[in-house]
A protein has these predicted regions:
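Generic beta-sheet signal
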Residues: 6-7, 120, 185, 209
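C-terminal active-site rim and adjoining tail of enzyme catalytic domains
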Residues: 35-37, 126-219
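N-terminal non-cleavable signal-anchor helices
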Residues: 4, 116-118, 173
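Metal-dependent phosphodiesterase/phospholipase catalytic core, i.e.
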Residues: 1-114, 156, 178
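Aromatic-lined carbohydrate-recognition surfaces of secreted/lumenal glycan-active proteins
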Residues: 94-135, 183-186
Length: 219
C-alpha cells in the first residue's frame, strides 16, 4: 500500500530488488540511499512539501521494464503505482502540491485493461483533482484529441545546445498556440536556458539539472 519514491536502476531495481514484488519495509531493509538516509516513501515527501507549502512535487511515472522488456506485469505495476499515489495524495490533501509526468509509451497495458499507462494515470490524477503531463513528442493536435492538456518534453526535440531542432516541425510556439500547457526538461546550457527563459511567462515549467544557475538567470 506504500509508494516508494526513487530513481530505479537500469533494470528498474531498487536496492537490487524488484519493487513491484516487495514491500517498502523490505526495500528499506535491503539498503539505504547513498547518503545513508532511509529510502523515502511518497508520504515522507508530501509531509515536507506540505510543511513549507511552496514546492510542487512532480512524480515521474515510468514504463517499468522487466529483464529489459516492456511486459503486461510491468505496465500494470506502473499504472497501479500512479493510482495508489493519487489515493495517498488525496488522503493527505496534497492535490495542489503533487503532479505527474507520465511515460509516452503507447502500448496497451493488457487485454483486460486495454488502455495505456498514460491513460490510466491521467484518469487517476483527474479523479483526485491533480494534474498529469504526457511525455510524448507528437502533434499538439494529438494532445487535444486525447484530452491531455499538458505536454512535458525534452529540449532535445525543440531547441537544444544552441540550435533550433523543432522535430517534425513542432516548435515551442506551436504547442502554446494549441492551448496546451508546456514544460521542458534538460535546459542545462546557458544558451538553452536563455532561449527558454524568453518564454518563461508562457511555459508551465522549465526543468534543469542546474536549478541555482537557472534561478539566477530567472531573477
Amino acid at each position: 500500500d506504500d509508494v516508494v519514491v526513487a530513481h530505479a536502476s537500469a533494470g528498474c531495481y531498487i536496492n537490487n530488488l524488484k519493487p513491484w514484488e516487495h514491500t517498502l519495509a523490505e526495500l528499506r531493509a535491503a539498503g539505504t540511499l547513498a547518503n545513508g538516509e532511509q529510502l523515502p516513501s511518497l508520504a515522507d515527501f508530501i509531509d515536507v512539501v506540505l510543511e513549507a507549502g511552496t514546492t510542487r512535487l512532480w512524480l515521474d511515472v515510468k514504463n517499468i521494464t522487466i529483464d529489459g522488456k516492456s511486459t503486461e506485469e510491468g505496465r500494470e505495476a506502473s499504472a497501479r503505482a500512479c493510482e495508489r499515489a493519487c489515493e495517498i495524495i488525496e488522503e493527505m490533501g496534497a492535490q495542489n502540491f503533487c503532479e505527474f509526468i507520465v511515460t509516452g509509451n503507447a502500448t496497451k497495458i493488457s487485454s483486460s485493461s486495454p488502455v495505456t499507462i498514460w491513460q490510466r494515470s491521467l484518469a487517476a490524477a483527474g479523479a483526485v483533482g491533480s494534474n498529469a503531463g504526457w511525455m510524448s513528442f507528437r502533434n499538439p493536435a494529438d494532445y487535444i484529441s486525447y484530452g491531455y492538456p499538458w505536454a512535458n518534453l525534452s529540449t532535445e526535440n525543440l531547441y537544444f545546445e544552441g540550435k533550433t531542432v523543432n522535430k517534425n516541425g513542432y516548435s515551442v510556439q506551436k504547442f502554446l498556440d494549441a492551448g496546451l500547457k508546456l514544460s521542458v526538461y534538460n535546459a542545462d546550457l546557458d544558451v538553452d536556458m536563455d532561449y527558454y527563459l524568453a518564454y518563461k511567462d508562457k511555459l508551465y515549467a522549465i526543468c534543469t539539472n542546474y536549478p541555482r544557475k537557472l534561478l539566477g538567470k530567472w531573477n
